[in-house]
Amino acid sequence: MGSWTKRPPPETLARIREIISANADGAIEAHDLRTRHAGRMMFIDFHLVVPSSMSVAAAHQICDRLELAIKAEFPDALISIHVEPDDQAKHSGRKVHGEEKDAAVAGLEVPTP
């Protein structure tokens, strides 16, 4: 299927997970990480669960922080973050704060057909 379906190496995925974990303070959970390459561009998207009481502005600040951190290491990345309020989210159980933070994104990647 050409370069659109090319997955990044496992160490790249691990690094993206680490960046998300280190920069998602204020969020509850991250899940459904998907990555693909098309030429030099890497497309990264994932879902970020935030407290339902969080303002749009606060959620946007978290997303900005995540995008800047990811782009610092992957400047050719196009990043899409789908924000979900926790009372409507499809929870994965992968928390991104407290003691569970490191494990939160360990299984973030979801294979895509």
Predicted regions: what they are:
Residues M1-P113:
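Alpha-helical transmembrane segments and adjacent TM-loop junctions that form the membrane-embedded core
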